[in-house]
Amino acid sequence: MKFPRLIVGLRPVIVAAAIALMAALSNQLGASAETTIEIAPASQQNGAWAGARLGTSPTETVGSAGCAITAVTMMLQYYDINTDPGTFNAWLTANGGYAFDDMLIWNAVTAYSGGRVTFSGWLGPDLGVIEAELDAARPVVAEVQLNGNQHFVLLTGYTLSGGLVINDPWFGDVVSFNARYGDPTIGILSIRTFLVGEPAGLRVDGRVSWLANAISAAQLAR
């Protein structure tokens, strides 16, 4: 006589468990949706700027080592800022936007864009952050290694079949991250994130401030 009562007593627990399971499955499906940002690829080896000296480097050019500024240029173009790697490089050189001759000071992006795009973070290879940024339609600059050398690409989306999608400045193409650099949990060394917003006080008389240079050179440039 007590057995039916036991079953009745368990029903709320079973129903609650079923609801929780359905919610978990729904969250997983939502997290697996595809996100892509259409950004035209650019090549650091384009003849229009490839031969230009990178910053004040005695040896490097935009073509040989301008991957970071080319990745940033593609991002800036996405935000409707009319520029290209050659123009960006010239401005950085004239306005103290490089540390140690040719290493991009990421804060300089804020000054260059007049505050329309602000550098917001130098982070580790956090795929959760990457997905959140892409879901918010904000491309992410990622540090990788190409033939043992430091390289930067622009993360523009992710798909169910191919994983992360990138614009690669060295090759000037759009390609799957996995196809070129392997597992992103290993292949991505660090990321740079950016927001659309107001200036952060990094301009002094039209130049990147010395304080920003000193801090960025020590903390943000390699």
Regions found by a protein language model. Give the residues of each.
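Bacterial N-terminal signal peptides that target proteins for export
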Residues: K2-V15
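Active-site-adjacent structural segments surrounding the nucleophilic cysteine of cysteine proteases
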Residues: P12, M22-G97, L146, L160, ...
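Hydrophobic membrane-insertion alpha-helices, especially the h-region
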Residues: A16-A20
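Active-site-adjacent substructure of cysteine-protease-like catalytic cores
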Residues: S57, S120-V165
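Catalytic cysteine-centered active-site loop
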Residues: N82-G128
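Extracytoplasmic/secreted cell-surface and envelope-processing proteins
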Residues: A99-M103, N149-V153, V174-V175
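Short solvent-exposed strand/turn elements
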Residues: L164-G182
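A recognition module on extended beta-rich or small alphabeta surfaces enriched in W/G with H and D/E
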Residues: F177-P199
